[in-house]
């Protein structure tokens, strides 16, 4: 393997197997939940080593590597401080942000959908939101929710958007994703059996939604 003058590594057109290795899928659990990966692109790999880590866990792991393992700043500070971006349009760029995910909130929301023994439903999320107890149930700061969603309409739109995405295209991507190193009580794959079906909202959800929007 030869290092170029620009600092990158050139492998002479050889794949990772030429060096007795394989390339990894670097999608984290938050990204896998909503399908933030490209078919036959960054979702490819032999193994997804951080596929069971939520976004905030990835940041914590990076800090741990710098502080405890390497005891120096191997990972640049910008890795932790730069505003994330989905880069889905010209308005969403690294540095300016534009990522529709509010990770301190959405990590906890998605975790409630997946990791609890009795998985939380959208109806329960709406009930807790109407009672003012959502932050307590999810384990996040209440200010994060109120700042991200100024009213019930924006909160509901966000909830439905991610719930639908989680159960449609994201399922197809997870099915084709590589094996995940499992560290939580429920990882995608064998721990979480799923089928690509139409997202479902029960009657209670629609009742609570109408109540919140009409108040």
Question: Can you describe what each PLM-predicted range is?
Answer:
Residues 1-215:
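ATP/NTP-dependent adenylation/nucleotidyl-transfer catalytic domains that generate, transfer
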């Amino acid at each position: 393997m030869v290092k170029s003058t620009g600092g990158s590594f050139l492998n002479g057109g050889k794949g990772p197997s030429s060096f007795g290795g394989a390339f990894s899928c670097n999608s984290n659990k938050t990204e896998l939940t909503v399908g933030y990966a490209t078919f036959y692109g960054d979702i490819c790999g032999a193994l997804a080593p951080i596929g069971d880590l939520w976004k905030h866990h990835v940041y914590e792991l990076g800090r741990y590597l710098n502080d405890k393992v390497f005891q120096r700043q191997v990972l640049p500070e910008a890795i932790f401080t730069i505003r994330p971006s989905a880069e889905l349009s010209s308005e969403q760029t690294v540095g300016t942000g534009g990522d529709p995910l509010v990770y301190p909130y959405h990590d906890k929301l998605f975790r409630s959908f997946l990791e609890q023994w009795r998985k939380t439903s959208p109806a329960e999320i709406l009930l807790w939101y109407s009672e003012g107890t959502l932050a307590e149930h999810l384990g996040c700061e209440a200010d994060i929710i109120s700042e991200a969603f100024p009213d019930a309409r924006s909160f509901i739109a966000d909830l439905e958007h991610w719930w639908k995405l989680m159960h449609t295209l994201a399922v197809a991507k997870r099915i084709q994703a590589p094996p995940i190193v499992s560290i939580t009580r429920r990882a995608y794959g064998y721990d979480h059996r799923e089928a690509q079906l139409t997202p479902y909202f029960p009657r209670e959800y629609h009742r609570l939604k109408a109540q919140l929007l009409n108040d």
